[in-house]
Amino acid sequence: ACVRPVKAYKNTPQRLSDKNAEKIDIVVLRECTEGLFYTAAVHNRNKIANNDEVEDIMRITRNTTMRLHNFAFKLAEKRKQKGKLGKVTCVDKANVFKSQALFRKIFNEIKDDFPNIEADTCYVDAMALNLIRQPWEYDVMVMENIFGDILSDLGGGLVGGMGMASCGEIGDNHGLFQPAHGSAPDIMGKNKANPLATILSGS
């Protein structure tokens, strides 16, 4: 799972004027090996029909999705012990895509194994709105790869920008931790890089 914390820190600029913005403390979870990115050109799995048409596939499998949702609920349990909301929100587009309907179906199956954790669902377009209106009402959010890529960047913007965004890619045996913005070579030598994302990734 790709773990993207979105947390407001004291003495940092807040993008939202509501005083509740100080309470923002979300974790965005996305699955890194499937979803729409599964057919990215780097994997050579997209279908090029001709110069005017290209097809990509959104791949969702039960086994991988079960692991992701289990990870989400177990993370919410740990966070609840530390005083967080103890809530998991499945973010999807189940009303349009069958692959997303499966993603939500598996979520609804697994939530019964964690009765002490609140579980709800939200369409991704509605969540984009909710993250601007009331992000402090969310805890752990779990979603397909491309949705997580987009919404986690939105979350970074809420708490001061990508220089505040850490990232962990956690597998069964290993983890990779890095700033969400990558190496950012475009700002090298300009004396404006924010080191906090790197520090947070290492903590």
Predicted region positions:
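A glycine- and small-aliphatic-rich helix-loop capping segment at beta-alpha/alpha-beta transitions
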Residues: 1, 43-49, 105-110, 159-168, ...
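Short acidic, glycine/serine/threonine-rich loops at helix termini
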Residues: 38-43, 99-104, 131-134, 154-155
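Glycine-rich phosphate/nucleotide-binding loop
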Residues: 130-203
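Glycine-rich phosphate/diphosphate-binding loop of Rossmann-like nucleotide-binding domains
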Residues: 48-125
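Short acidic loop-to-helix transition motifs that present clustered carboxylates
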Residues: 11, 122-129
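Structural motif
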Residues: 2, 24-28, 35, 87-89, ...
